């Protein structure tokens, strides 16, 4: 039986752990899917490449507003797809080749799960191909998978998820998206901008319900002018109609469409690992970790979607850096270890308009009993926003009265994911709203002035 110093399950952020410090250690890397994980292959990177194409199309369609006549002759979907995966697929292949060429690394390309802990304390790992090996330390970085509602599964109807929809052979005329979160909002934007009719089936009353209420309500209102929203509805059955689908909703209505995209969230892969055999605790579907990313089993760490509630690549990367350091420390030597910092975890939704957030929502701040000040600033109130003729972009800031401490920032509009970065920095380094507003120059007439004005408007 093969024996290793370290085994890593998953090649997303977990694949970044083995650097030159591990050259003397024998390692196993286990990956059942495409090398590189969700972000590289079916998540952050390809989706943003599709979003960029959508932004180009949207800009062309809106050009007449600025005195420029332009139109789209056609969308060459094959070329859109080829541009994306012609660049991404070679990265996955070269990443696997790089690991296979390392003299101290073996790659296992099937699903891997835990077996019983060995008498010497080493962890037994088993692959679906029948291979068995042991490791002294294990990193669980097995990621997550899409959630499919039971009614859709039971119906037997054809569906896509974010894992598959970017490789469809041709653009549909009409797509139905079941879901209301980040993934649903981004793909609604992509397909709509490329000329596809979009219908969203939403269980609640609004899109992006995890966002601050102001953002959620305004975004849903904007979305309703572009996409058909079926709110307070669930799919109860479905049928295949030729190459399309017919979905029956709980109000008795039927929606006919060419393609169904299920975007109802993702779930940790912790339940697929037989983690209990290794003494690894799993709660609410996720591997439990402490601030050092240690699990309940000595020598076993976890990171990313399999253990984190955030399901964000930048969080997984941060946790991977923590694990990378702590693997080289004695298990009990927490003085030498570093801890994860999840105080201010930002997120962005690359939809239209773009959305970004960090910290508390207004409702969360109120629920904590904090005395708060809130300011909402329109993009159109500053020179660059006025030049753009922007009528929907906003910056919403929440601070604690008295201390001026920034509690939350929520932005909807052009380049929201970039505009929010200095606010993340201010929160991380303890700057007050006043210090941030008056302690630096703000370039005029640049769009970040909307952040400056929001800061100055706080009382």
From Swiss-Prot:
Gene3D superfamilies documented for this protein: 3.30.390.30, FAD/NAD(P)-binding domain
Reactions catalysed, as given in the entry: 2 mycothiol + NADP(+) = mycothione + NADPH + H(+); 2 mycothiol + NAD(+) = mycothione + NADH + H(+)
Annotated disulfide bonds: 39-44
Residues that, per the record, bind FAD: 31-39
Cofactor: FAD
NCBIfam families tied to this protein: mycothione_red (TIGR03452), PRK07846.1 (NF005884)
Complexes and interactors: Homodimer.
Name the UniProt record assigns to this protein: Mycothione reductase
